[in-house]
């Protein structure tokens, strides 16, 4: 009897993960405003950016804050951040990706979307914040660069991204807060 209860609990998590993959795989595009906090250990940097996801073409972003970086943008094409171009005022810098992809303000959302489209979450649970029901998912990866963990919170209704925390070797290095979101 206990085994049956445990197996039923596992099935629910798989269904939630499947629903998330199906939703993000079918999503044609969205526009979002992101607030990103990057914790480099010795300093914490805050960024804001407008992000555009386009399933059929490239993703793009434009930094809106801090003012000293405002206007810098980038594009990422393909399914794995292998094609990344940093742009500013008509100039482009190709191959600007860091060695440890998915943990920088420039590529975090792109890689997180790939996890939501294709990844199998290690854990799925429900939470409530400010009266909104949320689905929370945790993704874990071991690589030659170390352990990467990502936790993402989506609205239960509509599966809209709300917040994410990214960890490298157990240390939180990045948070993403989605303050505006519109599917296109």
Listing of model-derived features with the role each one plays in the protein:
Residues 40-45, 67-73, 90-96, 144-150, ...:
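Short, surface-exposed beta-strand/loop "edge" segments at domain boundaries and coil↔beta transitions
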Residues 5, 9-58, 68, 182-184:
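N-terminal leader/targeting segments and the immediate start of mature chains
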Residues 1-3:
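Sec-dependent N-terminal signal peptides
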Residues 60-65, 123-184:
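Gly/Pro-enriched, hydrophobic low-complexity segments
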Residues 22-23, 49-54, 74-77, 122-130, ...:
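Short, exposed beta-strand/loop patches in secreted or surface proteins that constitute
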